[in-house]
């Protein structure tokens, strides 16, 4: 379980330009209107995709350690900030791939870290400037689904970092973004085993992010995407939409962390085992015994006694 932390005032918001601050405070006002006092955002994905950098960009300070040339640690980081009575919790997690495979130990550590917490939003992070998806992507999505259930994807967004990216060979930027996004969304759909009925009434939003210092800015000094969108307020807007989308948040209880109790599962199987034994073993055996008894010839004394009885009658 995550260690309790002393709540810190969200002073990083003051590092944003006034235009961004104004938009963020307006978004926080929506939570106040709905009488919501806290929000918990879980950030997951492979290593090296920009999870920690995104957390720092959102908070406006270096709250999560960024390890560019070193392997990530296994322990998640909880970053909590409060502003005007509202608490924002962001959980930065380690990469889920180790040696070309999903790191089950990392998954288990994350689950135990989240014990008794409620996930309001999942940010699944990957890079925009990657040209293909592979089986590892499906494995990561499958591992997240196995850990928290497929319903978590109804509270999720796909975040693509390195958005200040020039596609090769003169490809149209919007076309490349659409192609990359659709490829990853398809991986999420197949990896999470989402059926058509699961997808009715909701879609996973795609959010572009640029964490580097070379991110372009508008006349209000806000960091913008190539399309001109101020991406930090846009990210907060999408998070807010997801938190209020009507789907249930994911509560991480002991059952979710440890899985079903094998003893309870065994108790449920006992009646089935007895029924199976009776139908396939005992019942045919009893039937066979009765059949043998009926076919067995009667002894002489029984025939004599039955003959005397018939003459007397």
UniProtKB/Swiss-Prot annotation:
<dbReference type="InterPro" id="IPR027417">
    <property type="entry name" value="P-loop_NTPase"/>
</dbReference>
<keyword id="KW-0342">GTP-binding</keyword>
<keyword id="KW-0007">Acetylation</keyword>
<dbReference type="GO" id="GO:0005525">
    <property type="term" value="F:GTP binding"/>
</dbReference>
<keyword id="KW-0547">Nucleotide-binding</keyword>
<feature type="transmembrane region" description="Helical">
    <location>
        <begin position="269"/>
        <end position="286"/>
    </location>
</feature>
<keyword id="KW-1002">Plastid outer membrane</keyword>
<keyword id="KW-0934">Plastid</keyword>
<dbReference type="InterPro" id="IPR045058">
    <property type="entry name" value="GIMA/IAN/Toc"/>
</dbReference>
<feature type="binding site">
    <location>
        <begin position="48"/>
        <end position="53"/>
    </location>
    <ligand>
        <name>GTP</name>
    </ligand>
</feature>
<keyword id="KW-0812">Transmembrane</keyword>
<dbReference type="GO" id="GO:0009707">
    <property type="term" value="C:chloroplast outer membrane"/>
</dbReference>
<keyword id="KW-0479">Metal-binding</keyword>
<keyword id="KW-0460">Magnesium</keyword>
<dbReference type="GO" id="GO:0009536">
    <property type="term" value="C:plastid"/>
</dbReference>
<comment type="similarity">
    <text>Belongs to the TRAFAC class TrmE-Era-EngA-EngB-Septin-like GTPase superfamily. AIG1/Toc34/Toc159-like paraseptin GTPase family. TOC34 subfamily.</text>
</comment>
<feature type="binding site">
    <location>
        <position position="162"/>
    </location>
    <ligand>
        <name>GTP</name>
    </ligand>
</feature>
<keyword id="KW-0813">Transport</keyword>
<dbReference type="GO" id="GO:0003924">
    <property type="term" value="F:GTPase activity"/>
</dbReference>
<keyword id="KW-0378">Hydrolase</keyword>
<feature type="region of interest" description="G1">
    <location>
        <begin position="45"/>
        <end position="52"/>
    </location>
</feature>
<protein>
    <recommendedName>
        <fullName>Translocase of chloroplast 34, chloroplastic</fullName>
        <ecNumber>3.6.5.-</ecNumber>
    </recommendedName>
</protein>
<keyword id="KW-0150">Chloroplast</keyword>
<dbReference type="Pfam" id="PF04548">
    <property type="entry name" value="AIG1"/>
</dbReference>
<comment type="subunit">
    <text>Homodimer, heterodimer with TOC33, and monomer. Part of the TOC core complex that includes 1 protein for the specific recognition of transit peptides surrounded by a ring composed of four proteins forming translocation channels, and four to five GTP-binding proteins providing energy. This core complex can interact with components of the TIC complex to form a larger import complex. Chloroplastic protein precursor such as prSS (precursor of the RuBisCO small subunit) interacts with these complexes.</text>
</comment>
<feature type="region of interest" description="Homodimerization">
    <location>
        <begin position="127"/>
        <end position="132"/>
    </location>
</feature>
<feature type="region of interest" description="G3">
    <location>
        <begin position="92"/>
        <end position="95"/>
    </location>
</feature>
<comment type="function">
    <text>GTPase involved in protein precursor import into chloroplasts. Seems to recognize chloroplast-destined precursor proteins and regulate their presentation to the translocation channel through GTP hydrolysis. Probably specialized in the import of nuclear encoded non-photosynthetic preproteins from the cytoplasm to the chloroplast.</text>
</comment>
<keyword id="KW-0472">Membrane</keyword>
<dbReference type="GO" id="GO:0009941">
    <property type="term" value="C:chloroplast envelope"/>
</dbReference>
<feature type="binding site">
    <location>
        <position position="70"/>
    </location>
    <ligand>
        <name>Mg(2+)</name>
    </ligand>
</feature>
<dbReference type="GO" id="GO:0042802">
    <property type="term" value="F:identical protein binding"/>
</dbReference>
<dbReference type="GO" id="GO:0015450">
    <property type="term" value="F:protein-transporting ATPase activity"/>
</dbReference>
<keyword id="KW-0675">Receptor</keyword>
<feature type="binding site">
    <location>
        <begin position="210"/>
        <end position="211"/>
    </location>
    <ligand>
        <name>GTP</name>
    </ligand>
</feature>
<dbReference type="GO" id="GO:0019750">
    <property type="term" value="P:chloroplast localization"/>
</dbReference>
<feature type="region of interest" description="G2">
    <location>
        <begin position="71"/>
        <end position="75"/>
    </location>
</feature>
<dbReference type="GO" id="GO:0045036">
    <property type="term" value="P:protein targeting to chloroplast"/>
</dbReference>
<dbReference type="GO" id="GO:0009507">
    <property type="term" value="C:chloroplast"/>
</dbReference>
<feature type="region of interest" description="Homodimerization">
    <location>
        <begin position="67"/>
        <end position="70"/>
    </location>
</feature>
<dbReference type="GO" id="GO:0006886">
    <property type="term" value="P:intracellular protein transport"/>
</dbReference>
<dbReference type="GO" id="GO:0005886">
    <property type="term" value="C:plasma membrane"/>
</dbReference>
């Amino acid at each position: 379980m995550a260690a309790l932390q002393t709540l810190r005032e969200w002073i990083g918001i003051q590092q944003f330009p006034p235009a961004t601050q104004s938009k963020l405070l307006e978004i926080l006002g929506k939570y106040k209107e709905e009488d919501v006092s806290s929000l918990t955002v879980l950030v997951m994905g492979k290593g090296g995709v920009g999870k920690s950098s995104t957390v720092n960009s959102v908070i406006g300070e270096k709250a999560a350690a960024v390890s560019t040339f070193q392997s990530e640690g296994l322990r998640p980081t909880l970053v909590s900030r409060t502003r005007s009575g509202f608490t924002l919790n962001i959980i930065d997690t380690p990469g889920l791939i180790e040696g070309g495979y999903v790191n089950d130990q990392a998954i288990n550590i994350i689950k135990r870290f989240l014990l008794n917490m409620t996930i309001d939003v999942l940010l699944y992070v990957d890079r925009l400037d990657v040209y293909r998806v592979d089986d590892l992507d499906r494995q990561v999505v499958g591992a997240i689904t196995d850990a928290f259930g497929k319903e978590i994807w109804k509270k999720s967004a796909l975040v693509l970092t390195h958005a200040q990216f020039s596609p090769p060979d003169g490809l149209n930027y919007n076309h490349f973004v659409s192609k990359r996004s659709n490829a990853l969304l398809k991986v999420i759909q197949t990896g999470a085993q989402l059926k058509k009925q699961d997808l009715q009434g909701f879609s996973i939003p795609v959010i572009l992010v640029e964490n580097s210092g070379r991110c372009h800015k508008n006349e209000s000094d806000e960091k913008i995407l190539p399309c001109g969108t101020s991406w930090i307020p846009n990210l907060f807007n999408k998070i807010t939409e997801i938190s209020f989308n009507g789907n249930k948040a994911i509560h991480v209880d002991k059952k979710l962390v440890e899985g079903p109790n094998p003893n309870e599962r065994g108790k449920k199987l006992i009646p089935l085992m007895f029924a199976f034994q009776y139908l396939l073993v005992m019942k045919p055996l009893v039937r066979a015994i009765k059949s043998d008894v009926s076919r067995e010839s009667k002894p002489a004394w029984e025939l004599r006694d039955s003959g005397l009885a018939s003459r007397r009658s």
